[in-house]
Amino acid sequence: MGELKLINIDKETNYDEWLAFRTNGLGASDIGTLMGLNPYKSKIELFYQKLGLIPIKQDENIPMFYGNRLEEFVANMWEYYDGEDPESVIRNYAAGTKIRICKPITGYITNSDYPHLFLSPDRVMVSKETDKIVYGGKLVNKNFTGVLEVKTINGFASKQWEGGIPPSYVTQLQTYLFGLELEYGEIVFLEDGRKLWTIPMELNLNLRDKIVSEMNEFMHRIDAAKADIENVQMYEPEPDGTEAFEKFLNTKYADSESKTLQGSDDMFQIAVRHKVLAGEIKEMESQHRECSNLLKNHMKEHESLD
């Protein structure tokens, strides 16, 4: 077992120290990006942020703004939720009956077994209200029984994900579990501002190993790039198939020049495959559109087939 430590850095009063700490490691919320699961941010963007070559975005969007301010409320309501019936929150809250207990931790947690990782879970679970989680500036992690991650979610948007949640939420919670050396955690959701539900999760050792492998490989790139910053492009993560990676490259190379690059055999094969796939996609889209039109023409004003 690794040694867990609590590190307190006040972003508001010591921004430079906070920024240096953040850029020298990975947080649990970075893991989805690292694994190619974040539709809004690419691994290559994370790479340049950790090198300090592009800024870490600090501006809150509307979901982040309300999510941050609702975190305490949702965590408090989780304590009254029986895990099955959303209306149990109302009954237990009215009766003053807490089903389980969670507590916030101020600061970042590090684990000596994972030196590149820093953790800031929304809440940790404890058995009793009187259980301390920090004493004398040190963690009392023997009292941790689980970890709780709090999310607000739009019901319509959640339908695009298998299981109703973005896969990056899963990797985030799993990272908290192995980083805090816990076996159990939950994600609690407030859906559309009115429905509370949870997804319980146990530590997945296979996923842990994949995450740790990706972390180590990524941080090796970071360390190598810092030592050879003039040749930073040599250490960039390899392109993947995510739209976020495509968007980053389009922005980076927006100002192209009318020059020809001598290609290799590998690049030629990639270009051929790109052309073949583009043709297949176009044909599939045409077939999909034809099927859609046939169905619409057959069903007319009806909404479903029996």
PLM-predicted stretches and their roles:
Residues M1-D306:
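Accessory terminal regions of nucleic-acid processing enzymes
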